[in-house]
Regions:
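Structural preference for solvent-exposed beta-strand-turn elements
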Residues: 1-214
Length: 214
């Protein structure tokens, strides 16, 4: 029993895709008096195609399918690095998951999981936030312990505005500029421009001379 989610300034946070996916695995879910009531015996593997990509939806169905009976296919699954690492952790715990980072994830259910250890990947949203802060303040930054391969399209977008970026394997050098060019873009699922950096990019565009559209 959990309360229905709210939202934020960006918009509502519907959970319909989560519910549909879990019901496909055999969960019984109803909405009553502002709460989600869910129950199930052991979940049964199935195939579920997301109408649109959902990061947390993929994560929830992936975790549920891990202990479900039989095989589950998650089609149009999210490909974000965070989903890949979640799957890697589950595999380290005894799960049988294939197709991580691809459009279709296949899960063979197991009876139980055990403990495991994993090193969390660097936060790519925090990295972009720090990069933009450095550009806005016309400063120079050295950002360590990041993974530039997770940021290829955002970094290319930021280069277009006139900032200087130099990336190595786990490090990034940022140098601001007196002339920042306005940049327009559309947010997209990974590997595109993530929605979670549109606010930071909007702030960056406010110091440019010109018009931009997000």
């Amino acid at each position: 029993k959990v309360s229905l989610p709210g939202g934020c300034a960006i918009g509502a946070r519907p959970v319909d895709l989560h519910i549909q996916g879990l019901e496909k695995l055999g969960a019984r879910i109803e909405i009553k008096d502002g709460y989600l009531l869910a129950s199930a015996d052991r979940l049964i593997g199935s195939s579920y195609c997301f109408p649109k990509k959902s990061v947390t939806g993929t994560a929830n169905i992936l975790m549920a399918a891990t202990l479900a009976e039989g095989e589950t296919k998650i089609v149009n699954s999210a490909c974000e690095p965070e989903i890949v690492q979640l799957g890697e952790l589950l595999n380290a715990m005894g799960a049988r998951i294939e197709g991580l980072g691809e459009n279709c994830i296949t899960v063979q259910g197991v009876e139980n999981l055990s403990g495991a250890e994993i090193e969390i990947i660097p936060d790519r949203i925090e990295a972009i936030t720090m990069i933009i802060a450095g550009i806005i303040t016309k400063g120079e930054l050295k950002i360590e312990n990041i993974n530039p391969s997770h940021l290829e399209q955002p970094l290319e977008l930021i280069r277009q505005c006139g900032a200087q970026l130099e990336a190595s394997k786990q490090c990034l050098f940022v140098k601001g500029s007196d002339k920042i060019i306005p940049i327009s873009f559309e947010t997209e699922p990974y590997p595109g421009i993530p929605t979670d950096i549109q606010a930071q990019m909007m702030v960056l565009n406010t110091i440019t001379n010109g018009e931009s559209e997000i």
